[in-house]
């Protein structure tokens, strides 16, 4: 419907042509990606990249890749408007820092779980958490798991020593 009204000349110009104050041609490269009802989208892209550069980039790409390219340019332009110095690199860096903090918290929580399981198994030797232990299955032929057997499972925890854990996060 949009294309048919554009052929008749009754359609409103796209956001790019409106901002650039020019007539929106039927074959306007901007119109499929910058609709008239989203003027800020093109305004940011124009401010960061320039209309001529955006036009060149879109002309060089196959039609099926243009939507993704515009989406990327809009994201990068919005990030640059929010953070003029770092742009999207600042957002990526911030997210990477959050990942690093969360991974450290996860490692501490996993180390705490291992620490609590070891302490529980030493305090209550007959009530281990392992389903293969004789006390939990009641079968004398069950294999008993020794701490050496679990060494491979928690080998990545060797870097966390008990002294660095401090007090338990969940202690009262």
Swiss-Prot record:
Superkingdom of the organism of origin: Eukaryota
Pfam families: LOB
N-terminal signal peptide: none
Reported tissue expression: Expressed in young shoots, roots, stems, leaves and flowers.
Coiled coil: none
Region (Disordered): 125-152
Biased composition (Low complexity): 131-147
PROSITE patterns hit by this protein: LOB
Domain LOB residues, every copy: 12-113
GO biological-process terms attached to the record: phloem or xylem histogenesis
Gene Ontology MF terms in the entry: transcription cis-regulatory region binding
PANTHER family tied to this protein: LOB DOMAIN-CONTAINING PROTEIN 4 (PTHR31301:SF167), LOB DOMAIN-CONTAINING PROTEIN 4-RELATED (PTHR31301)
Family: Belongs to the LOB domain-containing protein family.
Name the UniProt record assigns to this protein: LOB domain-containing protein 4
């Amino acid at each position: 419907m949009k294309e048919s009204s554009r052929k008749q000349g009754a359609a409103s110009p796209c956001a790019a042509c409106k901002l650039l104050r020019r007539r929106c041609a039927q074959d306007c490269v901007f119109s499929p990606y910058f609709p008239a009802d989203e003027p800020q989208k093109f305004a940011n892209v124009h401010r960061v990249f320039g209309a001529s550069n955006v036009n060149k980039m879109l002309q060089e790409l196959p039609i099926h890749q243009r939507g993704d390219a515009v989406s990327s340019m809009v994201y990068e332009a919005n990030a640059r408007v929010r953070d003029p110095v770092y742009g999207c690199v600042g957002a990526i860096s911030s997210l990477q820092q959050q990942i690093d903090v969360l991974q450290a918290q996860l490692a501490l929580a996993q180390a705490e779980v291992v620490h609590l399981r070891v302490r529980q198994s030493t305090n209550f030797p007959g009530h281990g958490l392992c389903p293969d232990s004789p006390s939990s299955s009641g079968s004398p032929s069950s294999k008993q798991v020794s701490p050496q057997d679990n060494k491979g499972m928690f080998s990545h925890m060797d870097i966390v020593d008990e002294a660095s854990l401090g007090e338990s996060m969940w202690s009262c």
